[in-house]
Every structure is written in structure tokens, then in C-alpha cells.
Amino acid sequence: MKIELDSFSGNKIYPGRGTLFVRGDSKIFRFYSSKTASLFKQRKNPRRIAWTVLYRRKHKKGITEEVSKKRSRKSVKAVRGIVGASLDVIKEKRNARPETRNATRAKHAEAAKERKEKEAERRKAAKAAHVAAGGPKVSKLGAKGSAPKVQATSR
């Protein structure tokens, strides 16, 4: 025995009861009584009609003891060492004070700045030595040994 549900009120429809309404887009609506069919055809909202199941669900009527708070399980992330840093190093960095963190950051920044300046000086010196050596300016293609440009022979 198949028990259907009223499309408007949400009530049960037992075999031999109710009517079917098939809309133009072939969607089927089942109604328990002419009352629910009439309200549906008037385009009434079942959430606003006090005796419908949808109204009772919306306004939390009836079944209150069944509702219990859903408990979500939170995944706990295990802290472990990664490549290049052991667990001890990670814990030490995590527990470091902001002052020490800022000091080490400043120290590393200073060291990087000095390295950059030394590299710039080295490049400058290399360029100066190259210019001092003199020598003719040769295009890169000429230096690579590319084919010489063909001279015009018509004149």
C-alpha cells in the first residue's frame, strides 16, 4: 500500500483518496481534498496557512523532543616535523617572543642587504675592468661568428 503526500498541505493520502493535478510542464501535484486543491490553485503559500505541515515545521510546532543539537566532529591536526625543520625547531619558533622574532628578522634583512651591496660592487668592478681593457666593440652576433653581411655587387 503506497501512501502519497499532499503537495500543498503535506498530509498523507491513502489509496482511493484525493485527486491528481498535472500541470502543463507535466509536473504532478497530489491533493487530499478539494480544499487543498483550491488553495493551491489560488496560489496560497502553505507556510502561511496554520494547519499545514509546512506551517508547523516553519514555526517549530509539535516535535520538540526529537530535535537534538547536531554535533560535528572536529579534526585535530597533529603537529609533526617537516623536511628541513624538526619538531623541536618548529616548537621553538612558535614559542619565540615577538621581540626576538623581530630582532632575528632585522638581522637577516641586514645580512641580505650587505650581500646585495657586495654583489653590486663586484659587478661594478668587473664592468670597470672590462671597460679599462679597451678592445673594439663587437656585436654579440659578430662575436658568435655569424655569417658576414653580403655586400651589394650591382654598383
Curated annotation (Swiss-Prot):
GO terms for cellular component: cytosolic large ribosomal subunit. Residues 93-155 are annotated as: Disordered. GO terms for biological process: cytoplasmic translation. Transmembrane segments: none annotated. GO terms for molecular function: mRNA binding; structural constituent of ribosome. Keywords: Ribonucleoprotein, Ribosomal protein. Pfam families: Ribosomal_L24e (PF01246). Residues 93-123 have a biased composition (Basic and acidic residues). Gene3D superfamilies: 6.10.250.1270, Ribosomal protein L24e (2.30.170.20). InterPro entries: L24e/L24_sf, Ribosomal_eL24, Ribosomal_eL24-rel_N, Ribosomal_eL24_CS. PANTHER family: 60S RIBOSOMAL PROTEIN L24, RIBOSOMAL PROTEIN L24. Belongs to the eukaryotic ribosomal protein eL24 family. This is Large ribosomal subunit protein eL24.
